[in-house]
Amino acid sequence: MSNTAEFPLLSLIMFTPLVGAVLLLFVSKHSENTIRWIANGFAVLGFLVSLPLWFWLDQSTSDWQFVERLSWIPSIGAEYFIGVDGFSALLILLATLMGSIAILSSWTAITERVKEYYIFLLLLQTGMIGAFVSLDFLLFFVFWEVMLVPMYFLIGIWGSTNRLYSAIKFFLFTLVGSVIMLLGILAVYFYHHEVTGVYTFDITRFHELNMPFDLQWWVFLAFFLGFAVKVPMFPFHTWLPDAHTDAPTAGSVILAAVLLKMGTYGFIRFSLPILPEATQAFVPWVVWLSIIGIIYGALVAMAQRDWKRLVAYSSVSHMGMVMLGMFALTPVGITGSIVQQINHGISTGGLFLLVGVVYERRHTREISEYGGLSKIMPAYAAVFLVMTMSSIGLPTLNGFIGEILILQGIFVVNKVWAAFAATGIVLGAAYMLWLYQRTMFGTVNNPKNEGLADLSLREFATFTPLLILAVWIGLYPKPFIDRLDTSVDRVMARVNSTYAPLNAGAADEDEAEPGGGDLLAQIDGETTGDGFDRLVRLPVRGGSR
């Protein structure tokens, strides 16, 4: 079911950055300040027009909302079909916010080919939003591929020393995964025609398919390779540290905060609901790869001497935690996985911004080059402290909420898996606290650091929304979780045929398994006895309990 929009809000959100990019084509490349003002103006406008998604989203319905539908390529059944639920709405808000912050952070950092730089950033913004709103699989794939081009040029032109190598590596890894994913899309497309006689790329119809297990298995593998590269999961992660290290600050921020979420979004939106039986069969494999990623990413991060590379490997570890929660296949685990995606975008995006601040001043990312910065840049040190604590999951900050939900979701499925996940959290705290101690505390041994300027008003403005969100989600996550309930219910109804949300109206409590409605209230009220067990314990193949 879907609610058709009377006003094309999603198209407005999606194409606002594109309008800005087109407008920049007509501005002289020598008018650099004009270019910066236009790019920042359209980025902020894109965020402002996306805010109605927060206020107008109907949390009581599982229908797709703000739907727009037009015929696109009727000969093959492709449509301009877009819409959102709570999950995609939150990711759109994250994309528009982080895009605005990334563009603002580039004001003084980019001095060459300024016009092209901002055009690529705005095109990237349109591609990200388009992927999150697409309900037509071919349309989704088009936007998925569109994102590759601007990011390739952002790394290859405005990156650091090994930018060409990193850009090509990023492009090839993602392209290979995309081609394999396309084969899976076509398999679902032709199977749908075989059983219904209708050619369509309609994702909502694909969610209703009951494909044979053998076909599900192969399609899941194709989707897995496409999405796992994007997450990235171990062992498909090797492009990420290079891309992060050599990308300009804005590129790293968008890559960490939004682009990595394309992979996890794909799993939740496509793999789990379209291929439920194959999903359950692959659970042990995905979980163990996630656990390896959590531990491996943390251990390698501890060995880094490059500030940016350390944060890059922390992303491998954190996204492994996201995948672990997702493939617990429990309402709490999936909810925690989505919340942690938002949290990772906030904290890791903030950390890359912080690296960019000192790199712009010193043009080095070597951790050994710094020390005692809290004495010279107290405001910077304070912001870095909050982002560090957010990243390691300190209670009262956003990272804690996602991690505790994931651990709750995975614990009753398999306690060994939960123990490995907890180990990753401890290691994460170790390398982040080590980084903070090495860079912020001690004496200022390097004379080049003595004259470093603290955060400017513009720089502090880029961190302000991230600080607010880190505290808001940490203290009161309910508004975010409430917006996810129906999205999680839709996925759970497919991966578990016996699942029923609380708001399904079951006559007897034992007839319904909690998971819908107010998830936090359920956890508060059912953390003992059979209540909590019903909330998180769901049948999953291949996992011991």
Locate each region found by the language model:
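Helix-coil boundary and interhelical linker segments in multi-pass alpha-helical membrane proteins
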Residues: M1-T4, I129-L135, I268-F282, V322-I342, ...
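Central hydrophobic cores of alpha-helical transmembrane segments in multi-pass inner-membrane proteins
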Residues: S11-F26, N40-L53, L94-S106, L124-T126, ...
